């Protein structure tokens, strides 16, 4: 999804990104002010670097060995994410997919509704979203104690 983003899909004024998922299914994902600022900084630097090639409509670009700029491919993005996660994460696996799992779990742990998470991830079925959300045992215990009538007996 990320490598397919085009410049017109990223709207920092509205604080949203238009994402095209599987089977070209479109969804709108909100983004925060901090990310908007980083995107605007990226765009300024991208314009300076691309120069005459500024017409490239792809949001993410990379420089080829011959000096030309082109759309970033999935493998390059994977390598970048893996390297950066290795620098800052204690997780064993480092990939964009792990970031999706982490995002979904963090949203759930901070009170987001599972249906909202489903929409943000672009899942057609709730079952697919549930695979991405990892509740801790403590959270399950708290929910059980709060909601089940016989939990305190």
Stretches with model-predicted labels:
Residues 13, 22-25, 87:
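Extended, non-catalytic subsegments within catalytic or DNA/protein-binding/adaptor domains
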Residues 7, 32, 36, 101, ...:
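ATP/adenylate-binding site constellation spanning eukaryotic-like Ser/Thr protein kinases
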Residues 29, 78-119:
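Short, basic (Lys/Arg/His-rich) helix/loop patches that form interaction surfaces
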Residues 21-41, 55-80:
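C-terminal catalytic core of Y-nucleophile DNA break-rejoin enzymes
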Residues 5, 106-107, 120, 143:
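Short alpha-helical segment immediately N-terminal to, or the first helix within
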Residues 41, 135-153:
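DNA/chromatin major-groove-contacting recognition/catalytic segments
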Residues 1-14:
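Short, charged phosphate-coordinating catalytic segments
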Residues 9-12, 73, 91-93, 112-133, ...:
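Short, polar N-cap/turn motifs at the start of nucleic acid-interacting alpha helices
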């Amino acid at each position: 999804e990320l490598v397919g983003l085009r410049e017109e899909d990223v709207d920092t004024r509205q604080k949203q990104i238009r994402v095209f998922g599987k089977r070209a299914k479109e969804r709108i994902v909100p983004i925060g002010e901090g990310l908007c600022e980083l995107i605007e900084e990226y765009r300024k630097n991208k314009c300076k670097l691309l120069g005459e090639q500024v017409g490239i409509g792809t949001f993410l670009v990379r420089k080829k060995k011959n000096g030309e700029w082109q759309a970033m491919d999935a493998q390059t993005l994977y390598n970048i994410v893996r390297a950066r996660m290795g620098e800052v994460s204690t997780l064993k696996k480092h990939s964009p997919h792990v970031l999706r799992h982490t995002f979904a779990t963090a949203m759930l742990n901070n009170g987001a509704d599972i249906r909202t998470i489903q929409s943000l991830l672009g899942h057609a079925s709730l079952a697919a979203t549930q695979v991405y959300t990892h509740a801790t045992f403590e959270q399950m215990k708290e929910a059980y104690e709060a909601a089940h009538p016989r939990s305190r007996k």
